[in-house]
Each structure stands twice: as C-alpha cells, then as structure tokens.
Regions:
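Short Pro-Cys-Gly-centered "Cys-loop" motif that presents a nucleophilic cysteine in a tight turn
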Residues: 1-54, 58-59, 64-140, 148-279
Length: 279
C-alpha cells in the first residue's frame, strides 16, 4: 500500500499573503471585524495649539439611564463645576472631606490609567491654563463640551478626570457598577471664528437638532446646558419661569474663556439668537 505524498507547506511572502487566491482568504478590502457604530478611531490625536478651543463629545454606555434626567443632570453639572473649581476649597466639614476624598480617587484613577494628573484638576491648575470646560450640553446618551486646553496632555487628563468624576457620582447615585464612558472621546479643534460660532450654536441649541421646532418658545434656553450662563446671547435671558430664575441664581459651573477665538473672535459673525437652529 503506497503512502500518500506529504503535503509541502510553503512560507508565503508578505506580498503573496496580501493577494487572496480564492481558497485561503488573505487580505481583502473591507475584510475583518466591522467597527461598532459610533466608535472612535484610536489613531494618535494631533497636538493642537492652545489658542484653538476644542469641541469634545463623550458617549454614554448603552443601557445607562439618560443623564438629562433632573437628578442626574444636577450631578453632572456639579461634577463639571468641581472638576475645574476645586470643590474641597468651596465646602465645609464632612462635605469638604468627601470632596477631598473624591479628588484623591480621581487622581489615583488617572495614575492607574497612566494619564498625567498635572492638568485641570483644581481651580489653581485651571487658572494656570490647563483645562477648562467653557460650555456644555448634557443629552440623553452623550455630552457635548467646548473646552480650552493648554496641551494635548492637558486635554487628555482633563477629559479623563471629568469622565471619572461624573461616572463615580452617577454610579453612586444609581447603585450602578461599570464604565459609564466606555468609548474614546471625540475631539475637534475649532480654528476660525466661524467654526467657533457654529460649535457654540450646535452645543447650546443641540436639543433643537433632535426635537420638533414647535416645542420651543421664542426665548427658549436649554436647562441641561450652560446656556443660562452664556454671555453671548443677542438678547438678555428672560427670567419668566421659576426654573430659569433658579438656574440664573446659581454661580456658573463653567470657566470663562481665555482664548481669543472663544472670548471675542467668534462675535465677528454676530451674537447667538434664541431662535437659531444648529446646522
């Protein structure tokens, strides 16, 4: 009985491996695991000059409750305020102790992630130009931020610190475990006055982008955003409803802009109107 010849295994060159022969697969256009919807590329982020504000988007984990609910909205707003104003210095007694412990946990988590905690964690650092949240809008499953950052590292550590702070507080309030922000954040530099104005309109009036226009009055502002404290409206905000008066009486949770583009430059194209819609 004759033996079958032993199969010869031939080592393919890289060029051969990239050209499928119809039997063995190989590299093909659009082959492999498909990216998840809404996922962000893990390519290295470019280092943007500090003079350019950035539009940052944070997506919430699937299945997590809407952060635009009133109770959670207050938690997120407080986290934004504390991330750049230094909560321990603004509180007393046990509240100060809890705030200091929370800041320590944020710093420890940043260290575990391998992210520098040298930027954007306290009001002292914010005043040195590390990381500032200038405007925001909290929607059901994502957050829009307009921020200023002194460097690429300042942006990374500032966003990471804010994510940790929001996640810890929201999870504690809900008795929830697990990541609240599982995806990488998206960031886009705003390089011109027109780009900055468009981004401000998009962030502050974003709810109009998702909801029918007839739901909004002529002087409507979004209670889940920084619109009540925004100083670039073409008309003064009317305190004609109790919730507006309540918000207007609060100190701003955001930081004032320091870049020319975000403080002054965008106004060349006109102040924002309440009746505008995001593009």
């Amino acid at each position: 009985m004759s033996r079958r010849p032993r199969k010869r295994h031939v080592q393919l060159t890289l060029d051969q491996a990239r050209k499928p022969d119809g039997r063995h697969g190989g590299w093909r256009p659009h082959a492999g695991r498909k990216p998840k919807a809404g996922s962000i590329s893990h390519a290295t982020r470019p280092a943007e000059p500090a003079r350019f504000p950035q539009h940052v988007t944070l997506r919430i984990a699937e299945g997590a409750p809407s952060l635009a609910r009133e109770g959670l909205m207050k938690i997120v707003r407080a986290a934004i305020r504390d991330s750049q104003r230094g909560a321990p210095q603004a509180t007393q007694g046990r509240r100060a102790h809890r705030a200091a412990a929370a800041d320590h946990n944020v710093t420890r988590e940043l260290t575990r992630r391998g992210v520098s905690a040298d930027h954007g964690e306290t009001s002292e650092l914010a005043s040195r130009g590390g990381f500032r949240v200038v405007e925001f809008n909290v929607l059901g499953n994502h957050l829009h931020l307009i921020v200023e950052a002194a460097s690429k590292d300042a942006l990374a550590s500032g966003v990471a610190g804010l994510e940790i702070r929001v996640a810890r507080r929201v999870n504690a309030a809900l008795g929830r475990r697990g990541k609240l922000f599982p995806q990488r954040y998206h960031a886009r530099a705003l390089r011109t006055p027109r780009e900055v104005r468009n981004a401000l309109r998009y962030v502050l009036l974003n709810r109009k982008h998702h909801t029918a226009a007839q739901r909004f009055g002529r002087f409507w502002i979004d209670a889940c955003s920084s619109a009540p404290w925004f100083t670039g409206w073409a008309q003064p905000i009317r305190g004609d409803e109790p919730w507006k008066r309540e918000l207007l009486a609060l100190p701003p949770p955001t930081a004032p802009p320091e870049t020319w583009l975000l403080a002054t430059g965008w106004k060349r194209h006109g102040l924002l109107r309440f009746d505008e819609r995001p593009g």
